[in-house]
Every structure is written in C-alpha cells, then in structure tokens.
Amino acid sequence: ELEAGRKVQQALLPEQNPDIAGWSIWLFTRPANEVGGDLVDYLRLDENKTVLTIADVAGKGLQAALMTSKLQATIRALATEINSLSDIGKKINKIFHRDSLPNLFASMLFIQIDSDSGKINFINAGHFPPLIVNDKEIKELSKGDIAIGLVSNAEYNEQTLVLEQDEIFIAYSDGVCEAKNEYG
C-alpha cells in the first residue's frame, strides 16, 4: 500500500520545471519516506502569472500524504480565483482547518510570479523564510504568519518584492535543514 501511495504522490508532482519568460526556476523534492507531507507544485494562471507552492503537512506516512493531496487540490481549485494572496491564504486555511484532524497543520509558501512586472508576491504560512542571495550577502525574509490549519480565522500578510539583476530567490523546506550525510 505504501508503494502505491508513493506512486500516487509522484504522479501529483510537476513533471517539469515551470517555463516562465525571463526566469529560471528549479523545483526539486526527494521524500525522506515512502510517502509523506511534502508538496511542491506550480500552476500557470495566464501568460504572465504563475503560482508556486511549497508546503509541508506535519507528520509522516499515509495521514500526511492524504492531507497533502487534499491541500494540493484545494490550492489548485482556488488559485484561479486570486484577488489577493492574503485572501487565498485565508480560504486555504479555513478549508484545511475544517477538513483535517485536530492539531494537524501545514507550513506553506504560496508564491505568485508576474513575469511582465518582475514582481514576486508571496504569503508565508509558518514556513521557513525565503532567502534572497547575491554575491555579497544572504538575506532572510520575513518568517511569516501562522501555519495552515491551526486556527480557523488566520490572517496572512502578502509580501511583494522585485529581484535585482544579480539576486536569487530561494524557497526551501525542512529537508534542506535536516539533511545529514555520513559526516553529520
């Protein structure tokens, strides 16, 4: 059953990186277990706007995997109705809170890239803060708001930035921080 679950989760991942004019984007995920709560996804809204999601449902195994699939379906259903990222964050949270088990939550970065204006808009729901990297420094952005699903009436603050020519925007999940090799 876990192998079947892994195959379903793999099928839900994007087959390729998004092709956004003027941008170079690399999405990567490698689950630590057969199935789990990691979500990496994107959806093209129109010729200029693409949304990216990086999320991590708390826990491991089948429960986390099922709630991750539910979260992905919710995001995809609501993404085309964007008025503001704050609003979509509130809607995603309300649905996840309503439909999940008590004390189950997810961290999430929901990012909208506008290739026409060069803007990155995002909300951070309890996820690791994104980084801006250039040849001189690494800058950690805001830690964000409460994780998805903890309370039904959460608020999410939309942040906007425009990258300079030499800057890189990095969004990551716990696998980067918790990864260990034979040297620790």
How would you name each of these model-derived features?
Residues E1-I170:
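… and, occasionally, acidic/histidine-rich disordered N-termini of signaling adaptors
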Residues D174:
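Conserved catalytic-loop aspartate of Hanks-type protein kinases
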Residues N181-G184:
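Short, intrinsically disordered, charge-balanced linker/junction segments flanking boundaries
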